[in-house]
Amino acid sequence: MNKKSYLRRVRLPRTPADWLEAVMNFIFFLCGMLAVCCVVLISVYMVVSGVPAIHKIGIFKFLFGTKWASTAAEPLFGILPFILSSVYGTLGATILGVPIGLLTAVFLSKAADPKLRTVVVTAIELLSGIPSVVFGLLGMQVLVPAVAKAFGKASGACLLSAIVVLSIMILPSIVSVSVTALNAVPPEYEQSSLALGATDTEIWFKISIPAAKSGIAAGVVLGIGRAIGEAMAVMMVAGNSPNMPDSLFRSVTLLTTAIAKEMSYAGGLQRQALFSIALVLFVFIMLINVVLNVVLKGGNRDE
C-alpha cells in the first residue's frame, strides 16, 4: 500500500458530516466493546467467586457427589442431583416445546389466515411477557394438583411439572425466531418446488425448514437458555428436594433453584459453593452456544 492511499483511508474529518460520522462510529465501537467487557467481567467474576469452593471441596466430590447437606454439622456439597435435574428438565422441555413451537411457526409463516395469524402472534407475544412467578403460581395451583390426581401421587411437585412449565415458557422464543427465519426463505425455493408438483406439506418440511435451519436452531438455543436458566417458576413446582432425578415424579432441585433457595441465608463455604453452582451453570450455557456454532458451521460447509 503506498503512502497516498494510506492517507486517504485515515484522513481526519473535515466537514461537519465527517465529524458526525466519526463520532457515531466511535459510539458504535464503544457499545460493542461494552458488550464484550460485560461478558469478560461476568466470566472473571464467576471464576474468581466459584473456584475457591471447588478447590476446598474437591472437584470430584463437588461435581459427582450425590448428597447435598449444606447446613449439616458435617456439610456435604455434591451437586450431581442438581446437574442431572437441570439436564433432564431442559431436555424434557426441549422435547415437548420444540415440536410445538416449530409447527406453530410453520403455521404462522406459511398457512395461517392473516386475521388468525394476528390473534396467535398477539397471544404468543403476551405469553412472552408473562412474569416467571405467574407461570410458577399457575403451575402450583393448577398443574401440580392435576399431576398428583392424574398419576395417583401424594404430591405433584416434581420433575414432570417442571418440564411442562418450562416447555410452555420456551415457546415464545422458539416461535418468534423460527417465524422470522421461515419468512426469510427466498420465495423462489418454494415456487420451484411447487412447479415440480410438490405439495405444500412437502415444501414446508423439505424445503422451507431446512433452508431456515440456522435461524430455527438459534431459536431453539434461546429456548434452551431460558429453560436451563429459569429459577422462580421451577422452584414453585419442582418440590425442591435434593434428590436424584430417577423418576419424573421425583421432587427435585435444579441448579438455579438451589442457588435461589439458599443464597439469602448462606454464608462461608456454603455461599462459596452456591457461587460454584452458578459457575457450573455459566459453563453449561457457554458449552451449548459453542456446540451450536460448531454444528451450524459444519452444516454450512456441507451445503
Where are these regions (language model features)?
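Transmembrane alpha-helix signature in integral membrane proteins
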Residues: I79-F107
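Generic hydrophobic transmembrane alpha-helix motif, especially the helices
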Residues: E125-I170
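Amphipathic cytosolic juxtamembrane alpha-helices at the membrane-cytosol interface
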Residues: E21, I100, D113-T118, P186-P187, ...
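Transmembrane alpha-helical segments of polytopic membrane transport and secretion proteins
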Residues: M1-G32, L292-E303
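C-terminal transmembrane helix and the adjacent membrane-cytosol boundary/short C-terminal tail
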Residues: V179-N183, P187, L194, K261-E303
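Interhelical loop and adjacent transmembrane-helix boundary motif
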Residues: V234-F282
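Transmembrane alpha-helices
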Residues: V177-S178, D200-M236
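Cytoplasmic-entry segments and transmembrane alpha-helices of multi-pass inner-membrane transporters
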Residues: I100-G139, E303
